[in-house]
Amino acid sequence: MEYSRSYDMIRIIAGTYKGRFLKVPDSKVTRPTMDKVRQALFNAIKDKSLGSVVLDLFAGSGAMGLEALSRGAKQVYLNDKNRSTFVIMRENALSLSTEKDKIILSNLDYRVFLKRNTDLKFDLVILDPPYKFTINADIIEYMKKFSMLNDDAVIISEQDYPN
């Protein structure tokens, strides 16, 4: 499924799906990580996504996790609680038709997702919760407590901090 570029689209920066456009949910619901920021983040972690198991816990459009998939991730878990956002994320994931078996989609509250998946181990974790949530440290501690992080796991964390 190909999309033309418009204000509500972002693109995959590199890898197998370089240049593929992805739909973006309404900006009142999510804050999509823009192309240049994603490029800088993935350049900083270099080949960490190669062969990795990735969790994008507040996935929104799924762009961060799908970028990791495009760069060689073995398995990508995309989760978002918001139903309308999940529908867009699923559509974006399904547009990568050759990789559907590598993408696991969930429409759960982050706490439910974590509790149901304590048996998983992740190499790359993306935490970018909705505005005003300051929960990333608690999530990381939970994942450490249940050994959900591989020894050399990388965590990308973005959140607002109160002034």
Q: PLM features: residue spans?
A:
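Class I S-adenosyl-L-methionine-dependent methyltransferase catalytic core
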Residues: 2-163
